[in-house]
Amino acid sequence: METEDIILGKAKYEDWRSIYRNVWSRPETAEYMVWKVTADEDGARERIQRTIAWQETHDAWLVYERGSGQAIGFAGVEEIEPHIYHETGIALGPAYVGKGYGKQILRLLMEYCVSLGGQEFYYSTRAGNLASRALAVSCGLTFQHSEQKTDRRSGKIYELEVYKRNLKNSGSGMLFF
């Protein structure tokens, strides 16, 4: 799956260095996510092997910047009920935020779900993640509800906001935006 600027593709071992440098080592990227920062290059080499294994059986991908070929993020979806999908996380390294890549990723994910017969798409974000909230709204998702969750890393309570979009197929597998 690709756009003019990005490609969603399955991880390869040689991606460990760029995904580590751009995403996994960055606390500002992990802040609103449920994963921990990878401390060093050895940890990144181990993590890429787990990522490759995970992606073999899940609808999850690394995000590659088309111009540089570097792994700059990751994204995924899962079917939570028949024809109902939820994103499983969208992350971009801080140097790649604010370039429109998030919107391109989210649109690709929704188009992918349409191609699988998806009828509803859910997206969630922590209440404090204003950029993620703005991304949801900009892609036509509407707020549904919020719920309290406990951060598995810190044990702190946070508010998770859930957004939804009904997926409409144009007959060509493309969404109407």
Regions found by a protein language model. Name each.
Residues 49-62:
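A short helix-loop-beta-strand connector motif used in the catalytic cores of GNAT acetyltransferases and
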Residues 23-24, 33, 52-55:
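Hydrophobic residues in alpha-helical segments
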Residues 28-50:
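Conserved GNAT-fold acetyl-CoA-binding loop/helix
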Residues 1-18, 22-28, 62-177:
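Acyl-donor (CoA/ACP) binding surface of acyl/acetyltransferases
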